[in-house]
Amino acid sequence: MSVFEAWYMDEESGEDQRLPHKLSPNQPVSVQQLEHIGVFHWKLNADIYENDPELQKIREEKGYSFMDIITIHPDKLPDYQNKLKMFYEEHLHLDDEIRYILEGSSYFDVRDEGDRWIRIAVSKGDLITLPAGIYHRFTVDESNYTKAMRLFVGEPVWKAYNRPADDFDIRKEYVNSLGSS
């Protein structure tokens, strides 16, 4: 995967979550459709992430003051299988989720306004933001490897709220924002 790509998922398949799960025929999702639901993307040069002026500019503009790096691989992440299961549980956060893929590739799945799953393929150089309140999940692809920078506004909050979480104020705000965009 070298091109940023998104599509509606085949939700009926019980196959391995790490597979693409494209419908036949494929139903692509445009960048504009993603932006409509609050998902934004930048393509950066991950080889220079430590000194990248473009990344620094985005961090300053968005207030991303904290960052760390996570490596998701069976040999690098303790309790790998259970972590993958946890990441793949449908959930939301009270804050935006910001991830910058430094190496490898993976998928973010997000719900559209009609509650359909959209799969977003991310790979080296992709920086993606998911808005607070959006239902989503994450999985590696068949490579079983992703190294990502996690960015936060202020101190990191690691709490995920599994669905159903429709009574949360942040979820209500997110849903209301879809009607006004």
Curated annotation (Swiss-Prot):
Pathway per the UniProt entry: Amino-acid biosynthesis; L-methionine biosynthesis via salvage pathway; L-methionine from S-methyl-5-thio-alpha-D-ribose 1-phosphate: step 5/6
GO MF annotation list: acireductone dioxygenase (Ni2+-requiring) activity; acireductone dioxygenase [iron(II)-requiring] activity; iron ion binding; nickel cation binding; oxidoreductase activity
One GO CC annotation: cytoplasm
Entry membrane topology: Peripheral membrane protein
Record's subcellular location: Cytoplasm; Nucleus; Cell membrane
Cofactors demanded by this protein: Fe(2+); Ni(2+)
Keyword Repeat in annotation: no
Annotated binding of Ni(2+), by residue: 91, 93, 97, 136
CDD domains hit by this protein: cupin_ARD
Main location class: cytoplasm
InterPro entries, alphabetized: ARD (IPR004313), ARD_euk (IPR027496), RmlC-like_jellyroll (IPR014710), RmlC_Cupin_sf (IPR011051)
Binding sites annotated in the UniProt record for Fe(2+): 91, 93, 97, 136
Entry's family note: Belongs to the acireductone dioxygenase (ARD) family.
Protein name (record): Acireductone dioxygenase
Gene that encodes the chain: adi1
